[in-house]
Amino acid sequence: MNKIQDELELVLPTPEYKTQVEEYLQEFFDNGEYEIAGDGGLDRIKNFEEWLLKVQKDLSEESIEDNRIPATLYLTVRKSDNRVVGNLQIRHKLNEKLLQYGGHIGDSVRPSERRKGYASWMLNN
């Protein structure tokens, strides 16, 4: 197993990650970045509990908001310090907009953790 594989894991968001997710979001804003790819709307909603509920609803076509498509969002967490270093969203099908501009996968890595191979790892796992 490579070093990055040993360092990281993909996890579904849960209430236990509230502080880590809020710090993750704030780092983007502090870096002047106000749009986060594949974040399930975190950059717009900004409230963890509301965002978590939306992410959970997004899992199923029966509970998703109108004009949305089912998607699974994962947090990329570094095991050694439980730090959220990225996010990965897998969209289970595409609508017209996503066919043109988004695709099946959206991902981001927090600014201070870039250029470490984390995005490549997320896409390969």
Give the residues covered by each predicted segment.
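GNAT-family acyltransferases
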Residues: 1-104, 111
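Conserved acetyl-CoA-binding loop-helix of GNAT-fold acetyltransferases
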Residues: 106-109, 115-125
